[in-house]
Amino acid sequence: MQNTLNVLINIKYSLKSLTLSLFLVFSVTSISEEYVPIPLDKLVCYGKGSQQQLSPSGEFLAAMVPVDENVCDIKDETDQEMMATDRVLVVTDLSTMKPKVLSGTTAGTSITSFRWLNDKKLLVSRDSRAGLDSASMYTIDRDGKNTTLLIKAKRFKNKPGFEVPSLYGVFPRFPDKVLISLFNSGSRSRDLYWLDINTKRTELVAREPSVPGEIVMNWLVDWEGVPRGFATFMEEGPNKGIETTFYKFTSDGYKKIHSCMHQQACFYPSYFDIDNKTVLGVGQAVLPNGKILNETDTNAMWSYDMDSGEYIEMIYHDPDYDLSSPMHGDYSLDMWFSPDGSELYGFSYQGAKTEKIYFDEYFATVNKSLEAAFPGNEVSVFDWSDDLTRFLFGVQSDKDPGSVYLFDISNGKTPVSRIASYAPWLSEYQLASTEPFTYMSRDGVKLHGYLTLPPTYKEGEKIPFIIHPHGGPNARDYWGYNPEVQFYATRGYGVIQMDYRGSTGYGRKEMMLANHEMGKSMQEDKYDALFWANEQGYVDMNNVCISGASYGGYAAMQAATKSPELFKCIIAYAVSYTHLRAHETSEN
């Protein structure tokens, strides 16, 4: 590994050259003599997404790519056939950079995902516009030969419904089989099976447990492919949809680990360590009796012994931000493991921007080298070869939804090459910058938000503003490209996005401060963000609007009645009127 580190040092000058090139490109874009706002269709035109994965050796790159050139071309979304046939699966030999189209799509059918099984063969999942009952899985060699159907969805003969296969996981220890789930549309259960890729035979691993009044959300599987536990949420009774329970399997069935309600402290087990005994998870160290060890308010990462039921240690804790919040639908924690699962390289989570924690020096060096080559952007390494010499990484920012690059350490001349860009046409225009900020509410609560100023903004200028609260309300905003915010900002408006109390990501206490406050302090938090921006000298207070969707739309409509003197216009869409009715009839 030290030799590879030396190679990294040797190519740092190439990365510096790349940084200079990018700087010159961005500089040319930013010094246009006459500002021309980006056309609306360019902002709302989403590029054709792509999935990429390196083969285990890193010698081949597989990708689902657009059939046509990735240009901004808004199509009729009712043309389902066109939507279903716009991507093909391509494998590129990285030594020659020659691509090979393995499989396209037929009318009404599309590839939904793929996975390298080894350097020669890929597993492909296919779907159909005709419905879930037409899904299938097959293997294909990297040269496009030996296409073999493994399993497909089937309708039941003697009862209504059908069974749909989907990939659950690939395990390095078992190269000849994969773990799949079979979804039963009648019972809504997902049973686990081994699928042999040579014989096509399936072997039952576990049937989904039937817990009265609860529905299984997911399995907890170890590195041997053995289910060790599962999580449910309440489907019936007064706690419907707001209570989660975690179980572990025992010799005679299963045993409850703990339950937690919405907003309560909760430990969410996520990944097994390679010892198949220790579980890594996020949340609070909650004991079966409800007591909390070393309460942290924000969700921390813990290691947990599945056999003894004891918490081993708190691995990492950020006092300001949750390391994701699975209980509230936030699965943003990204953990990086070695190819065989024996080592945790590190992880990332969402603070004001993406935060990264490293446990492996080499992996940290790779990431930091790439970050230095793309200043002002967020860099995320998401795939790598078994020998850690080739990496795929994404680059995105507040002005760009992202591109994918290949980093080849063995290529000292051109170590970094772009292989896909989500919306390349955006680089032709000047877009607005978004910056995180913090502010204090009128009752002394520290809150977070994002400020976006127009590309033409001049220091000291007071400009029209739009307050743009997110939906949810149990959600949050993130730093990155937002076409709606860019639409406002490129038309000359400043934009404020605020994570008012009740937002996720900032701990339980801040979330609970929103209880009984939907039309009260939650609403005032939005106005206080505006007042903060005004104190900084940005706002023309005679020209302020508020816009939002879902709960954000509710907040906009509340503003029309609660503080009409602040706003010149209200923009509300996809409004959750149940919020309005609930506020009229209840203090909850």
Question: What annotation goes with each model-predicted range?
Answer:
Residues 4-19:
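Bacterial N-terminal signal peptides that target proteins for export
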Residues 27-28:
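N-terminal signal peptide c-region/cleavage motif recognized by signal peptidases
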Residues 32-390, 398-400:
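Beta-propeller folds
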Residues 50, 216-220, 231, 346-347, ...:
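Non-catalytic accessory segments flanking enzyme active sites
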Residues 426-536, 540-542, 549:
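Cap/lid segment of the alpha/beta-hydrolase catalytic domain
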Residues 531-577:
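Primarily recognizes the serine-hydrolase "nucleophile elbow" in alpha/beta-hydrolase
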Residues 578-585:
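Conserved small/polar residues in nucleotide/adenosyl-binding loops
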